[in-house]
Amino acid sequence: MAGRSKGMEPRLAGAGCAPAPGLDWQNDGAAFYPDAALSILPHLDALAASYPERHAGIRLHGHPALAAVLPSLTRIAGHYIGPEARPVRAILFDKSPGTNWSLGWHQDRTIVVRERREVPGFGPWGRKAGLIHVEPPFAIIERMTTLRVHIDDVPANNAPLLIAPGSHRLGRIAEPEIPAAVERLGILACLAQRGDVWAYATPILHASAASVGHAQRRVLQVDFAAQMLPGNLEWLGV
């Protein structure tokens, strides 16, 4: 694929709740927080160990370990969507030699709600892992932020997330137009080390290749929102 392609060095200046330099949130839709999750790694390890291996993505709800890891992540999300930020979905991804996959370029377009209520603009509906998913009006997705917390190192050969910087500003992108958007905007490989956190504007175009190494790649992904849903719909939360 032509266009700009580069890797973000995983050890840039800054830690905690200060993003590393090199990216502009408004223009790029991404921010990198080196070492931001170091203090919660024991809880993340316990969370990951409580689930069997060989599961591509486990949707989390009500797990006690989440209570220990969410406050610091919510503070980061609040930088981008305001003080009312709250976690609304959590997924544990676990790539390993026994469970490996690739993911084509796409935008995240669904949310998880407590129960189905017919509201104009919401649909189609579906279930994943027993949870109710629905595609909302895209303006809701545009006001969300996603954090990915790295439990393992993610060098270039361990399937880093690939993003098209700036694609979050393009609205809902029709499937046939995605390749041209990626070609035009270029690709950023989001390298990371254990304990690093990446933040993204939820609508950003992203993809991931299969891992070509033999290492495990566990990532906790949490979506955050600050707005209420219309028509008595409720976020399920985590």
Regions found by a protein language model. Name each.
Residues 9-28, 36-194, 207, 211-215, ...:
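Non-heme Fe(II) oxygenase catalytic core, chiefly the N-lobe of the double-stranded beta-helix
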Residues 237-238:
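Glycine- and charge-enriched low-complexity intrinsically disordered segments
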